[in-house]
C-alpha cells in the first residue's frame, strides 16, 4: 500500500451546547448562505444563545443547533418547503420522536 492509498484519519469535533458557532460558521457547516440561517431564526427553528442581538453578525449559536438547522434545511430542500413549513414539520417530527421514546421507556 502506498502512502496515497493509506486511509486518512477521520478528524471531527463533537458539538454540544458548550461550543458556540457564529452565524457564518453555522452557515458554512450547513453549506448554505447566511440568509437561510437568518430565515430559520426568524421562523423560530433555531435560536441564538443571546437572542437580544439584532444583527446576525452578533449572533452565536450553541453547537447542538447544527443538527436541528441541518434537518430543517434538508426538509426545505427535499420537500420544497418554505422556512415556516419546515419549522412546522420539524416540530411534528420531534413530537413523534418524543412520543416514541416515551413509549419505549414504559
Where are these regions (language model features)?
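Arg/Lys-rich, alpha-helical DNA-contact motif
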Residues: 2-24, 34-38, 42-106
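Residues within the alpha-helical elements of helix-turn-helix
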Residues: 29
Amino acid at each position: 500500500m502506498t502512502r496515497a492509498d493509506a486511509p486518512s484519519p477521520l478528524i471531527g469535533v463533537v458539538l454540544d451546547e458548550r461550543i458556540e458557532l457564529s452565524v457564518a460558521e453555522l452557515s458554512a457547516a450547513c453549506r448554505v448562505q447566511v440568509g437561510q440561517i437568518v430565515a430559520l431564526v426568524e421562523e423560530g427553528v433555531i435560536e441564538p444563545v443571546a437572542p437580544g442581538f439584532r444583527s446576525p453578525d452578533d449572533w452565536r449559536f450553541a453547537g447542538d443547533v447544527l443538527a436541528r438547522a441541518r434537518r430543517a434545511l434538508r426538509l426545505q430542500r427535499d420537500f420544497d418547503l418554505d422556512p415556516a413549513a419546515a419549522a412546522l414539520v420539524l416540530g411534528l417530527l420531534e413530537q413523534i420522536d418524543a412520543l416514541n421514546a416515551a413509549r419505549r421507556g414504559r
